[in-house]
Amino acid sequence: MDLLTSSVKDFVAATASKEPTPGGGAIAALTAATGAALAEMVANLTFDKKGYEDVQEEMHLLQQKAEFIREKALSLAQADANVFNLFMDALALPKNTDEEKLARTAAIQQAYKDAANVPLEIGMISYEIFDLAYVAATKGNQNLITDGIIA
């Protein structure tokens, strides 16, 4: 399933299915993307707004950072599913001979590393959203304060 082009309904249905992907990593990445999108929305709705002239540069920077994180998080949602599938492929490798066992073990170890790196990246960009949300909630358009807080 291409998580980036599926509908929200299909994405959620796929998550609820008997299939192992999308799983927790993809959901965490999607949550990060929506948080960044909310911060970005606050910035976009603060631009050129009367009373917010002194934070225009900060909102521009917020918008750029949030857009970057949003796009990165979306790519990580798909990456999480991809690395999990590669891990499952490694587990399915033959293990009849000593050579096959060594190759399988090496593939599994590499797949573990790859599979661990994606959630680590998701966590790192999710942490960055706290700063964006703080700026959005405290300096952005106050009609959108709840969106900034939820981000």
Protein language model features and the residues they cover:
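Amphipathic, well-ordered alpha-helical segments in soluble domains
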Residues: 7, 11, 34-41, 76, ...
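Amphipathic alpha-helical interface segments
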Residues: 80, 84-151
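Alpha-helical scaffold segments that form or flank carboxylate-/histidine-based iron centers
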Residues: 20, 61-69, 115, 147-151
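Conserved phosphate/anionic-ligand binding catalytic regions in large, soluble enzymes, centered on
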Residues: 17-40, 144-151
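A structural-propensity feature for long, helix-poor, extended segments
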Residues: 50-89
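Transmembrane signal-anchor/signal-peptide helices with a preference for the extracytoplasmic
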Residues: 41-53
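Short, hydrophobic/aliphatic alpha-helical segments
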Residues: 3-22, 138-141
